[in-house]
């Protein structure tokens, strides 16, 4: 579960290393975000000489959470970290590579470009 002020790792090569959630896109007063939700975040740590810089406000989609994700078939998936992929206004990733495992639920939420870039889909 991701809430405002939560720090997340960045799972792509867009230039950002760490994000801090500042708002959850969706309903007017959502408290938590889960895998597949879009958030507004600020870049807390970035790689030098890249397109994204520190203190820049971006949109990101959550791809991994430490909180368990229960599927309809009873399977429970839990990751070791909270991670997100930086996206543009159309929902396309800003990076060209995605690192780490990605949940299958992103495919049903129309983030197929992120799923196709991922090395492993759980």
UniProtKB/Swiss-Prot annotation:
One of its GO terms (molecular function) is structural constituent of ribosome. CDD domains: Ribosomal_uL14. It comes from the Eukaryota. Its main location: plastid. InterPro entries: Ribosomal_uL14 (IPR000218), Ribosomal_uL14_bac-type (IPR005745), Ribosomal_uL14_CS (IPR019972), Ribosomal_uL14_sf (IPR036853). Pfam families: Ribosomal_L14 (PF00238). GO terms for cellular component: chloroplast; cytosolic large ribosomal subunit. It is found in: Plastid, Chloroplast. Keywords: Chloroplast, Plastid, Ribonucleoprotein, Ribosomal protein, RNA-binding, rRNA-binding. The keyword ATP-binding does not apply. GO terms for biological process: translation. SMART domains: Ribosomal_L14. Belongs to the universal ribosomal protein uL14 family. NCBIfam families: rplN_bact. Binds to 23S rRNA. Part of the 50S ribosomal subunit. This is Large ribosomal subunit protein uL14c. It comes from Acorus calamus (Sweet flag). The lineage of its organism: Eukaryota, Viridiplantae, Streptophyta, Embryophyta, Tracheophyta. The gene is rpl14.
